[in-house]
Structures are given as C-alpha cells and as structure tokens.
C-alpha cells in the first residue's frame, strides 16, 4: 500500500493534512475517542474544581509532550499506522493531538473566567446590599 504522503512531501496546509489522512485507522479512531472523553470530562468537571484543575494540568502536560510523542511516533509508526504521518515540523501531531487538547484547556479557562466574574458580581451585589442596610439603619 502506498504512503498517504512521505516526510519529504508532507503537506504544509491544514486542509491538505485533513484530506490526505486515512481517518479509518484504528489508532486515529482511538485518538478521536480519547478527545471526546476529554471533552466530556471538561464539560462535566465544571462543578468539581479540583478535578478540573487536575484535568487542565494533564492537558497542558500532554501538549507540552507532543514534540517528544511526535519523535517517538516518527520512529515507530510502522507498529501502529499504515502511513508515516509524523513529520519533523509537527504539523500532523499539532493538528490531531495538540489542537483538541488546547481547545479543552481553553474551555476550562473560559469556565474559570466566567466563574470568577460571577463571584465578583455576587460579591459586589452583597457589598451594595450591606451598604444599603447600613444606610437605612443610620437613617432610623
């Protein structure tokens, strides 16, 4: 079976990578399932702060490790893949591995910012109510 693309002629654009990838390979389907599980954990961990922090740190560590994972996968691709997808620039690993993880991390940060704004709004409301009660007591 011929290669989807060789390392020398690896596509430089995201649409080319997406179009030339065999998305039916079992390891890619497993990676997709992993990303879906990460997304579910991101969504359902919003009420469990410690779990969300741990999940966020795992996401960041995995993204940080992507270069090493790419190097190992480039050497051992025949063990799990039909084609050599792992180029020296890291385009493929960035697209199929790091980008979804960074998306999850971004969602978590958005949740944290939203939660912080909600707490700040609630605090300001309580301060205003307290100020109003003091003013009323003073008038009496």
UniProtKB/Swiss-Prot annotation:
Main location: cytoplasm
Intervals of motif Nuclear localization signal: 130-138
Coiled coil (residue ranges): 118-140
UniProt-recorded Gene Ontology molecular function terms: DNA binding
Spans traversing the lipid bilayer: 26-46, 53-73, 92-112
Single GO BP term: cell migration
UniProt-listed Pfam families: TMEM18
Start and end residues of each stretch annotated as DNA-binding: 113-140
Record's subcellular location: Cytoplasm; Nucleus membrane
Membrane topology listed for this record: Multi-pass membrane protein
GO cellular component: cytoplasm; nuclear membrane
Keywords: Coiled coil, Cytoplasm, DNA-binding, Membrane, Nucleus, Transcription, Transmembrane, Transmembrane helix
Keyword Protein biosynthesis: no
Role according to the record: Transcription repressor. Sequence-specific ssDNA and dsDNA binding protein, with preference for GCT end CTG repeats. Cell migration modulator which enhances the glioma-specific migration ability of neural stem cells (NSC) and neural precursor cells (NPC).
Name of the featured protein: Transmembrane protein 18
Organism: Mus musculus (Mouse)
